[in-house]
């Protein structure tokens, strides 16, 4: 769907929860009294992971500090970090839980975590000049593409070179939304004109493979849940997955 936020909520919550804009979290530290806001009371992927004894962390580029619930950094209109790209900040059970808030970290923390004990699930978000989309301070499409490519090379390279990367590890690169302004259909009614994004899976197992089935962000959540042997949340319950990209023999 459009804009960004509902897609991020779908990735970890299995629903868009009626959200149709990029309004801030009701827990934002710099929320003004006049601003509308969103929050989600229900369960998320974080609850599922921790209930199963697994760990998570968000690594957000240009987030000022761990647990910071600021709307933007630097402040708008020059924002690089944008809260609309951090779905964890919207869930009550995360934003009101100090221990979980500490798992929402600046990207720089990834280096230390890769050298020690990395989380079972790492959710990495580039800033708005490195995500291929751009902002008021970075509009040139050629530079955006180059910077996005450099970000991926550096980040994926660091992960794969770390002690935590094993034959059971995987990286999924995806986007929140495409350029189309059309409202996407359900997977079963997909058309070529719908909102489409590229999604790439990286593992050390098998050769190149393609999944050309119509998928959405519920499919990504379902794939993560199936991979960790978790039950599926909400609209992820009936979603097709990307598992054919991972169910391949390792050398």
Outline where the language-model segments fall.
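N-terminal pro-sequences and low-complexity stem/linker regions of secreted or lumenal proteins
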Residues: 1-251
């Amino acid at each position: 769907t459009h804009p960004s936020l509902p897609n991020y909520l779908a990735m970890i919550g299995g629903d868009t929860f009626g959200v149709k804009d990029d309004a801030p979290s009701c827990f934002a530290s710099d929320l003004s009294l006049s601003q509308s806001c969103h929050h989600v009371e229900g369960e998320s992927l974080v609850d599922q992971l921790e209930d199963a004894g697994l760990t998570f962390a968000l690594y957000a580029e240009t987030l000022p500090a761990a647990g910071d619930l600021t709307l933007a950094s630097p402040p708008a209109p020059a924002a690089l970090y944008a809260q609309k790209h951090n779905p964890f900040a919207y869930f009550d059970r995360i934003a009101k839980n100090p221990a979980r808030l500490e798992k929402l970290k600046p990207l720089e923390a990834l280096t230390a975590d890769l050298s020690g004990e990395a989380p079972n699930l790492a959710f990495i978000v580039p800033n708005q000049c490195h995500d291929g989309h751009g902002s008021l301070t970075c509009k040139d499409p050629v530079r955006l593409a180059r910077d996005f490519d450099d970000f991926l090379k550096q980040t994926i390279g660091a992960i794969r070179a770390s002690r935590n990367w094993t034959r059971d590890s995987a990286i999924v690169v995806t986007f929140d939304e495409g350029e189309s302004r059309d409202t996407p259909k359900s997977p079963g009614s997909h058309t070529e004109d719908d909102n489409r994004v590229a999604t790439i899976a990286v593992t050390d197992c098998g050769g190149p493979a393609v999944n050309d089935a119509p998928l959405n962000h519920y499919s990504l959540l379902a794939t993560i849940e199936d991979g960790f042997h978790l039950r599926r949340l909400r609209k992820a319950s009936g979603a097709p997955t990307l598992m054919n990209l991972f169910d391949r023999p390792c050398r």
